[in-house]
Amino acid sequence: MLLCERQEIAEFMPVYLKYLFKQGLNLSSVQIINCHAFNDISSIAEKLPLVPGSEQIRKTVFLADAVPGELQKRKSMLNAVRSSTYFSKMEYCAHFFFPGKKSPKRWQQGYFEDMLLQSLDRSIVETGAYQNFYNLTEEYLLCVNNSRGQDKPLCNHSRHLLYAYFAATENFVGMHLGEAALHGAFNLNHSAFDDLKDLLKQL
């Protein structure tokens, strides 16, 4: 079971799991749940037994952004696992913070979209147009940030950059990240996914 902190993560994971299956990774049946937030994981744990098929779950992974509050999220997850009767029956519980690991014992500080931005497929627009599109998008976001002022900067820059960039393309305008991934916006074989793939192999 994959417990996702945000809708974008929950929408992307089925696409990535399908890709891994096509690459020969034999994953058992995976249930994906959008928890919306991990502020109160204990309450989430109480509701999980009510989800159809939850009694068959043996392994759980928490998927969340490293910011804000990686340390607090990790503590909440550990407390929930230790105190929950449901989680205590699991063979395996783990967490993964996007965009991935900085070192074997440290996570990069960032967001899910930071990982996707690294893997953006440059071939999705006409040859030579990628850098122009990208630069124009960066300039647009810079103008938006300047207009918001120093007190209210854009949060999760990569997310805004991806959606603004897709709006300038014919193939991905109006799509959410999961849809864009399904239609080939990202190179799912990119090294940015290595940490996530290694974790999913353990399911």
Give residue ranges: language-model regions:
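Hydrophobic packing residues within well-ordered alpha-helices of enzyme cores
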Residues: 13, 64, 77-78
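RecA-like P-loop NTPase motor core
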Residues: 1-56, 61
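Short acidic, S/G/P-rich loop/turn micro-motifs used as interaction or catalytic elements
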Residues: 9, 67-71
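Active-site-adjacent loop/helix micro-motif of nuclease/hydrolase catalytic cores
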Residues: 40-44, 70-77
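Surface-exposed acidic loop/strand-edge motifs in secreted or periplasmic proteins
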Residues: 57, 69, 81
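Nucleic-acid enzyme cleavage-core boundary/entry regions
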Residues: 3, 7-16, 20, 48, ...
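Activity-critical C-terminal alpha-helical subdomain
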Residues: 72-162, 166-167, 171
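Short loop/turn segments at strand-loop or loop-helix junctions that form parts
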Residues: 60-67, 98-100
